[in-house]
Design a protein with these regions (language model features):
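Metallo-beta-lactamase
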Residues: 100-147, 151-154
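Active-site neighborhood of phospho(di)ester-bond hydrolases with catalytic His/Asp-centered motifs
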Residues: 46-49, 69-77, 97-100, 158-161, ...
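Cap/insert and terminal regions of metallo-dependent hydrolase folds
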Residues: 168-269
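Active-site environment of divalent metal-dependent phosphoester hydrolases
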Residues: 31, 79-82, 103-105, 142-143, ...
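Active-site metal-binding motif and surrounding structural segment of the metallo-beta-lactamase
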Residues: 52-98
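Structured catalytic core of nucleotide-sugar glycosyltransferases
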Residues: 24-34, 75-85, 107, 123, ...
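Conserved beta-strand hairpin/beta-sheet module of binuclear metal-dependent hydrolase folds
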Residues: 10-62, 146-161, 179
Length: 279
């Protein structure tokens, strides 16, 4: 089996060619989720799960500031996806895109007086600057959780984290992604044996509206694998019930079995951003 190509090998640009899109996962996990996608015209966050101060710090690390954001997209209302929303979007008047059920739950949880909501119906598509955003339903224990496919001039970015199982609809949507963030939350045995998780929480995580295991993520990837997918990020890894090495090994083994050498595999982290992908 030939050695898997690195991100740099797959996305190396001709010398002096300008960068059309930059993508950075600022952090992913149960303590906060946030990704930054930018073009020449548009800069968006997908989720705002870190405090405003921490979000600003992580953006500064990639040479960016929240004042320049065009929008914040919200997948669902759990705290690890919205904890920084009011302080960022409210203070800076950044439009917040979500569906009505998520908005109503956010209004119950946060002070939203200064938030400018722009509502979509799950399943709809809309434009933000030069980006087109497709939305789709995902199975999770939130009011109306969604995933996104974001179309740019250089490819499609998919986001499917926080889902208990992968429906046909989810498969159909993420199959179109060139760059995909997919949940690989836990190892089932580690979760079952974890002394820090009460049985009720274990049941929730393992349910069809909980979180994807490493094996479930690998199974989903096998279902969608095609020439479209070029970069796969493993997201929302549990600190107590998974390890980066285990999540990576399970997915890498599956990709090798499928001879998917065209796919570059990367881990996300809770404590620091991933390297920026420049396209």
């Amino acid at each position: 089996m030939s050695q898997r190509k690195s991100v740099a090998q797959i996305f190396r640009r001709p010398y002096c060619q300008s960068v059309a899109v930059r993508f950075t996962i600022l952090g992913s996990g149960s303590a906060g989720n946030c990704s930054h996608l930018e073009t020449d015209e548009t800069r968006v966050l997908v989720d705002a799960g870190f405090s405003p101060r921490e979000t600003r710090r992580r953006l500064a690390g990639i040479g960016r500031a929240p004042e320049n954001l065009s929008a914040i997209l919200i997948t669902h209302e759990h705290s690890d996806h919205i904890s920084g929303l009011a302080g960022l979007a409210g203070k800076l008047r950044i439009p917040v895109y979500c569906n009505r059920a998520t908005k109503e739950e956010i209004e119950r949880i946060l002070e939203t007086r200064n938030l400018e909501f722009r509502l979509f119906v799950t399943g709809d598509s809309f434009e933000i600057g030069d980006l087109t955003v497709d939305t789709f339903a995902i199975p999770h224990d939130a009011q109306d959780p969604v995933g996104f496919i974001i179309h740019s001039s250089v490819g499609r970015f998919g986001f499917a984290t926080d889902l208990g199982h992968v429906t046909k609809l989810v498969l159909d949507r993420i199959r179109t992604a060139n760059f995909l963030v997919l949940e690989s939350n836990h190892d089932v045995k580690m979760l079952q044996d974890c002394p820090r998780r009460p049985w009720s929480l274990k049941q929730r995580i393992l349910s069809r509206h909980g979180h994807l295991s490493n094996e479930a993520a690998a199974d989903a990837t096998a279902e969608i694998l095609s020439g479209e997918l070029r970069q796969l990020y493993l997201g929302h890894l549990s600190r107590d019930c998974n390890t980066p090495e285990l999540a990576f090994t399970v997915m890498q083994r599956r990709l090798q079995q499928l001879a998917a050498n065209h796919v570059s595999l990367a881990l996300t982290a809770q404590d620091q951003p991933c390297p920026t992908l420049e396209l």
